[in-house]
Amino acid sequence: MLTNEYLKRVYDGLAKRNANEPEFLQAVREVLESIQPVVEKHPEYEKAALIERLVEPERIISFRVPWVDDQGKVQVNRGYRVQFNSAIGPYKGGLRFHPSVNQGILKFLGFEQTFKNSLTTLPMGGGKGGSDFDPHGKSDMEVMRFCQSFMTELYRHIGQFVDCPAGDIGVGGREVGYLFGQYKRLTNSFQGGMLTGKGLTFGGSLARTEATGYGLCYFTAEALKCMRNDSLQGKTVVISGSGNVAIYACEKATQMGAKVVTMSDSNGYVYDPNGIDLAYVKDLKEVRRGRIKEYAETHAGATYVADCTQVWTVPCDIALPCATQNEINKESAEALVKGGCTVVCEGANMPSTPEAIEVYLSNGILYGPAKASNAGGVATSGLEMSQNSERLSWTFEEVDAKLKGIMEGIFHASYDASVAAGSEGNLMVGANCAGFLKVATAMMAQGITY
C-alpha cells in the first residue's frame, strides 16, 4: 500500500496519464510500494523530482514495419523501442515479436529491465522493444524480410554505446542473426556489442542460451541455502512454459537433484510423475517446433491437460513460472499453497499478479521476484558484450561461473536490502530497493536535466 504522499501523488498522476497500460502501472506500483522506506530517508529525491523522471521513459520510438510475404502481398506491422533509462549504462533489453506487443507492455518490461540490470552490477541501462509481428507460421524468408525491414528503421536509434537489444519471446537465434546482418549491412560496421544473443560464429557467448534458466536455479539454490538451510536436492518442481527459459531451468534443476514434473505451452500442460524427459522436449520445441501435448502421446504415465492455467494445481515443493506475465493469479497461488509449495522463483517477467504475491507472503512462501531471479539472461548478455569489447571468447565454464557468481550476488544484495528496509526476507522489497538505489544515485549525480 502506498502511504508516502510524494509517491502516491506521482503514481496517481501516472495512472491518469496511462490508464490504458495496466501492466506498466502494476510494475510501477510494486516498485513504489517497496521503495517507500528508502524515499523517506532521502527528501532530496522529491526536490529533484527524481521519481517523476524515473517512471517516464527517456524516449519511445514507434514505427511502421512494411514487409512482403511469400504470396507477394505487402504486410504492415508496428515496431517499438522503449529507451527507458540510461543512468548507469546504454539501454539494454530484449526485442519481443508477438501479437500481444503494445506500448504499455514494453513500457512495463523496460521499467523492470532498468532495475534488473542494476542488480547485475554491470553497466547497463534499461530498455525494451519489439513488434506485434508473429513469427509462428511464417517461412524463414518471411521472417528474414520482416527482420530486415524492422532493423532498417531501428538501426538509427541503437549502437553498442547507445542501445543494445537482445532476443526475447519470438526472437531467437535465427531472428537475431537476421537483425545483426541487416545492421551490419546498413552501417558498414561490425559492432558485436550492439546486439546480444548472437550465434557463436559471429560474436555470441557460450552459455547465453542457458543463462536465464540456469541463473534462475542458481538464485533459487542460494535462497534455499541461506534462508532455509536447504537445497534443490530431492525437490519436486513444477515449471510452466516450454521455451528457452523453461527448458534450461528444467535442465539445471535436474542437474541439482530436483525432479521436474511439468512443462506447458499456451494450449495446456503435461504432467510426468517420472520426471520430464528433457531431451524429448528439446527436440519437440527447438527442432520440430511442436506442441507440448505430443509429449503425453509418446510417454507412458504422462498426462496432458488442455488448460495451461491448471499447471499450478500439481503438488510440488518449488514452482518456477517461466511462461509469461500474470500467469499466476490469486486462485493459482492458493492452489500452489494447497499443493505443498514452499518456494516460488520467477523465470518469466512479472508472472505473478499482486494478489498472488500477497498469497505467497501471507503463507510464508520463499518468493524470488523476476527482476532478481531471472536476471541471468541479461547478465550473460552483459558478459557477451564484455567478450566482444575484449575480442575474446570465454569457455562455457568461465561464463557459467561468472553467471553463478552474479546470481548469488543478486540474492545477497536483495536480502541485505530487505533487512535495511525493515522487511527481512522479503526479496521483492529487497530487489526493488537495491536496484532502485543504484539508479537513483546515478541520476542524482548526473543532474536534473537527466
Model segments located where?
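Adenosine-phosphate binding glycine-rich loop
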Residues: 2-27, 223-224, 337-450
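Flexible, glycine/charged-enriched surface loops at secondary-structure junctions
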Residues: 22-25, 43-48, 121, 158-167, ...
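Structured beta-strand/loop patches that form or line metal/cofactor-binding pockets in enzymes
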Residues: 44-73
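Glycine/serine-rich phosphate-binding loop and adjoining beta1-alpha1 elements at the start
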Residues: 98, 117-233
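Glycine-rich phosphate/diphosphate-binding loop of Rossmann-like nucleotide-binding domains
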Residues: 199, 204-313
